[in-house]
From Swiss-Prot:
It comes from Sinorhizobium fredii (strain NBRC 101917 / NGR234). One of its GO terms (biological process) is nitrogen fixation. The gene is nifX. This is Protein NifX. Keywords: Nitrogen fixation, Plasmid. One of its GO terms (molecular function) is metal cluster binding. Belongs to the NifX/NifY family. InterPro entries: Di-Nase_FeMo-co_biosynth, DiNase_FeMo-co_biosyn_sf, NifX, NifX-like, NifX/NifY_domain.
Amino acid sequence: MNSVRRLSLVTDEIQPRRSGALRIAIATQDMKVLNAHFGSAKHFAVYDVSRDGWDFVEAVSFDDVSDESGKHPIEGEDRITPKVTALTGCHLLFCRAIGGPSAARVVSAKIHPIRVGEPEAIQDVLSRTQKMLKTAPPPWLRKVLAQAGVAEKKPFEDED
């Protein structure tokens, strides 16, 4: 049985995104460091990040997770769908690793997965994302921003 908990500061509903912000999810075991693979993440810290700063939105927690080898205690149990569903509304997903089938489902939910090689403090991930928004974002991020309605896509921009 998959179990999910939503911990938020104000309400138990999905909060509307702050105007001009990207909603990002960070895979974590301890709510302090980006240190989890997508499938084995016990928590996802969700933030709205804009050029001006960031706001904590919610923590989504799971009781039953895969180990980092991808093995499930109960074979055949779907552990991907509840996580993808819980991240609905996010634009970026930062994680240590993500398998092909999971990545395909995340992308089809219009969430851009970003693999980070080494553990990194959540505050550093937020700062780096904010810096990318303040400066000239790379083409892949401009595309995400346009799809999220955060920035207008100019007709002369490349689709790289």
